[in-house]
């Protein structure tokens, strides 16, 4: 056990250059690469992402107002209708674009909201 403690002390006292050289020597001696664990770790999320691909079908969407366009007053009116906000709150939302208009809505509702706002000249995105 004292040998291990001594080894830890010696390794702790190495400079960065000495530690890099030690790493190279150990790679050669043991026939391994220090980069291998990184490659394995990078592959794990990719595999997890592939497994999650079927679940990728979103059921809830956020409607984002990117800009109000030329007909800001009409967009404010539609925002009030869609969200139930008061005049000041709807105006602040429109003037503060990009802002989320509605969160967690289904795809059909998100598309309807987008269509209504775009008819008024707004630029809208769905996430």
Swiss-Prot record:
GO cellular component, one term: cytosolic large ribosomal subunit
One GO MF term attached to the UniProt entry: mRNA binding
Record keyword Iron-sulfur present: no
Record flagged with keyword Ribonucleoprotein: yes
Keywords assigned by UniProt, alphabetized: Ribonucleoprotein, Ribosomal protein
Record GO biological process: translation
InterPro entries: Ribosomal_bL12 (IPR000206), Ribosomal_bL12_C (IPR013823), Ribosomal_bL12_C/ClpS-like (IPR014719), Ribosomal_bL12_oligo (IPR008932), Ribosomal_bL12_oligo_N_sf (IPR036235)
TM annotation in the entry: none
N-terminal signal peptide: none
Top-rank taxon, per record: Bacteria
Subunit annotation: Homodimer. Part of the ribosomal stalk of the 50S ribosomal subunit. Forms a multimeric L10(L12)X complex, where L10 forms an elongated spine to which 2 to 4 L12 dimers bind in a sequential fashion. Binds GTP-bound translation factors.
Function noted in UniProt: Forms part of the ribosomal stalk which helps the ribosome interact with GTP-bound translation factors. Is thus essential for accurate translation.
Protein family per UniProt: Belongs to the bacterial ribosomal protein bL12 family.
Family matches, as NCBIfam families: L12 (TIGR00855)
Name of the featured protein: Large ribosomal subunit protein bL12
Taxonomic source organism: Acidiphilium cryptum (strain JF-5)
């Amino acid at each position: 056990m004292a040998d291990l403690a001594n080894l830890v002390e010696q390794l702790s006292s190495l400079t960065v250059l000495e530690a890099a050289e030690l790493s190279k020597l150990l790679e050669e001696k043991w026939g391994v690469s220090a980069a291998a664990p990184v490659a394995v770790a990078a592959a794990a999320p990719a595999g997890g992402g592939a497994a999650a691909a079927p679940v990728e079908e979103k059921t809830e969407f956020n409607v984002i107002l990117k800009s109000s366009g030329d007909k800001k007053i009409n967009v404010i009116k539609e925002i009030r209708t869609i969200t139930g906000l008061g005049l000041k709150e709807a105006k602040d939302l429109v003037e503060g674009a990009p802002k989320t208009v509605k969160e967690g809505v289904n795809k059909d509702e998100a598309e309807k909201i987008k269509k209504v706002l775009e008819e008024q000249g707004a630029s809208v995105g769905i996430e």
